[in-house]
Amino acid sequence: MAMDSTTLLDNFGRKLLDELQANARLSLAELGRRIGLSPTATGERLKQMEEVGILHGYTAEIDREALGLEVMAFIRMSCGGQNYHRLRDYVQTLEEVRECHHLTGGDDLLLKVTTTSLDDLEALIEALLPYGNPVTSLVLSSPVERRKFSVTGKLTTVTRKSPKRRR
């Protein structure tokens, strides 16, 4: 019997997602032991989560620097009009583009890119010029990288005190 996404995200489902985010290579027996289900029930739950789109595959994290991709940068693109669609299609063909996000505000797209050198980054920026105005920020370090989704605990939010109004 198929479950909907709400039912799949019960206590067992949330524990399962936490375990998979920590180590997606665990066996069904070990996953089941950790979340309190049999290996068969765990496997069925995984299959259903894949079918409804909660899970989208199991990937390895690869160290970009081990591949010689020493430079990481964000490029904000302002293009507008017809150039937006052309640029969106073009960046999908670029191996250097790791992520591309459509934005509100003054910029149209935000690209996360990696290259082997500053020379390669410069060549990439020049290739983007016909599509609009690229503004580049080099990444010096990443204090928070690939944060897991909080699925079993509450999300932590920062609260600010409201400023006192002058009368």
What are the residue ranges of the model-derived segments?
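A compositional/biophysical signature of low hydrophobicity enriched in polar/charged and small residues
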Residues: 1-167
